[in-house]
């Protein structure tokens, strides 16, 4: 939907440094969850309870992960496991920010560090 478009445009507009691309991924993901509001954890739980909605969620996750893989490809071959770990961190940090447990900035900084570490592991 709309968030996917915003994310794609932000990635296209970002410079070619790893830090900037990773920063776009981190800030877009967290902001997307915060924009959708505090009901998101409940929505995610509801999505998981229905096979059709679970399939839709997986489809959107696959699109997001493909975009991330492509954006980070110049800096290293990121594994599917690494991308899944990043997504798990992104969800957990975004929900913690949405519930007020941590700040938006803390969520984005931690996610950025997670992405940078994932890419650096893929290089070795």
Where are these predicted regions, by residue range?
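Amphipathic alpha-helical linker/stalk segments
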Residues: 1-23
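Amphipathic alpha-helical packing segments from all-alpha helical-bundle domains
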Residues: 2-5, 23-24, 28-35, 51-74, ...
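Regular secondary-structure segments
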Residues: 4, 8-11, 30, 87-98
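Hydrophobic/aromatic-rich alpha-helical bundle segments in the mid-to-C-terminal region
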Residues: 41, 45, 54, 72-118, ...
